Amino acid sequence: FNLRLTQESVWSLIVLYKMENNFKNKIINGDSLEELKKIPSETFDLVFADPPYNLQLKNSLTRPDRSKVSAVNDKWDQFENFKKYDEFTIEWLTECKRILKKDGAIWVIGSYHNIFRVGTAIQNLGFWILNDVIWNKNNPMPNFRGTRFTNAHETLIWASKSEKSKYTFNYQSLKCLNDDLQMRSNWNLPICNGAERLKKNGIKVHSTQKPESLLHRVLLASSNKNDLILDPFLGSGTTATVAKKLGRNYYGIEKEKNYFKAAEERLKKTKPIEDDFLDTLKNNRSKPRIPFGSLVELGIIKPGTSIFDQKKKIVAKIMADGSIKHDQAEGSIHKVAATILGSESCNGWTYWHCTVNGVSVPIDNLRQRLISKN
């Protein structure tokens, strides 16, 4: 019985591996609503969706010099009414939720024309909204008619599959990206232009091509190397391109033939970053929290042991309850170190040292050994 069960388990893993490989590093030319239904449940780690915005443009836009503005007036962005758009939104979001892994997440980007309707659908379908992020465009298109504020931003909604999902968030990497400051939810990034903008005979290939810098931040924040990323509205292929560069696997669906071909050519020219340079900083929160007192309880460090600063000028004794005592103060390893330094706070794990096999080491070394054993 055990052997049969093992064989069945192995066979299931093989089937799962083959199914997942069917969607690795591929893009297809097809209707998203039809293609999503063909994908097995719980296939993807992350979804990035840039759906039609339903801009409702009834007239062409012109500049003050009467030249025509290259705006979004494509058929794929046109819907009969809000009801039809809502039905479309619910249909593709439902499929995306089904094919996300239980700890997966989704990003959806939009403008004021559609993002509030999309956000309602996201909540109604049981996703759990984590953040809304404002993409402030450094170089937005002006409001040529002067009838409204210049529309200088787009909104991204980031949501996990459910409230209980253990989604990926590379906090330390994003903090490092932002000069050691917490990454905020307003991102100042330029729109796509220059050499990055795909053109054919001098004309933009795609009217709403997203900048690679935006997807770089999204994928770095919420996915890991070798994760499988889905873009159900691939467009000119920015998501797949950045995923390939960052060592993520991608699967894209694009209905428009000319966009699909442009994305295909773009991916052929894209070179991945060397694997050695793709490691991300580990989150401190992912490490188990071990109080200093636990080292005392477990006998790793004994009451009465002397601990000292790096220069061995400050000495304190360890008490049975995990507190420490010094001439100037007593309390936790952090509190006593802060008092001695005259500061509001101090990381006692790195301030205090002890002697191990005749060598002075930070007491954090003892904690790290305990963590590695567990």
Which residue ranges define each predicted feature?
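Acidic/polar loop patches that form or flank catalytic/metal-binding clefts of enzymes
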Residues: Y167-F169, D275, N347
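Core catalytic lobe of class I
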Residues: Q7-I253, N258-F260
